[in-house]
Design a protein with these regions (language model features):
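C-terminal active-site rim and adjoining tail of enzyme catalytic domains
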Residues: 2, 33-45, 112-192
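Metal-dependent phosphodiesterase/phospholipase catalytic core, i.e.
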Residues: 4-111, 115-119, 131-134, 138, ...
Length: 192
């Protein structure tokens, strides 16, 4: 379940739910009552880890303050759990909050990091290098052939967000990004 980050730093429930307001203002019990489009319930990260069990790559986006250490503790338990298929290379951590990424990197250098940015993608290169990130994930509208080339030359993969129209998906393929973040994976007629 995704949410919208406000300019003030809070996370709003998106238009795909039956509730409005800051996620931080809801208790876990209240969030359990939120209905996502199609009548689905919002899963906890722990429920997602149990369900997926390492069968696919998982992008965990840190969206709130003080989420880095809690996320590290939770995923580490799954790495160590008997019968778990989770390994550090099956998860990556991303965030627009670069301070949270720094905190995560201080305690866990095994799990890959991707830098999310809504500003000039080139501004993310220094923090990406500092944190040993594997990818920079910018707003797709900020990508040009020159920007893509500079990011690639700096050693990063690119997974732009949120690429939803068929035309934009094709443009990202032409720019030779590694993959995309989309709300409509069924619109992708071939893999990147």
């Amino acid at each position: 379940m995704d949410s919208l980050k406000t300019k003030l730093g809070g996370c709003l429930l998106g238009v795909l739910t039956n509730r409005n307001g800051l996620i931080e203002s809801f208790s876990l019990d209240s969030l359990r009552k939120v209905s996502v489009l199609g009548g689905y319930q919002i899963p906890t990260l722990e429920e997602v880890l149990q369900l997926v069990n390492g069968e696919v790559m998982l992008n965990i986006e840190l969206k709130g303050d003080q989420t880095a250490l809690l996320t590290h503790e939770l995923i580490t338990r799954y790495f160590d759990r008997e019968g778990s298929q989770w390994k550090p290379e099956r998860i990556f951590i991303s965030s627009f909050d670069w301070d949270e990424l720094k905190i995560f990197y201080e305690v866990n250098k095994e799990v890959p990091i991707a830098i999310l940015t809504e500003d000039d993608p080139l501004d993310a290169i220094p923090i990406g290098l500092q944190l040993g990130a594997f990818a920079i994930n910018p707003d797709f509208e900020k990508l040009t052939p020159e920007v893509v080339q500079k990011i690639h030359q700096s050693g990063f993969e690119i997974y732009p967000w949120t690429v939803n129209t068929s035309e934009d998906i094709e443009r990202m393929k032409m720019l030779r990004v590694k993959g995309i973040i989309t709300d409509f994976p069924d619109r992708i007629n071939q893999t990147f």
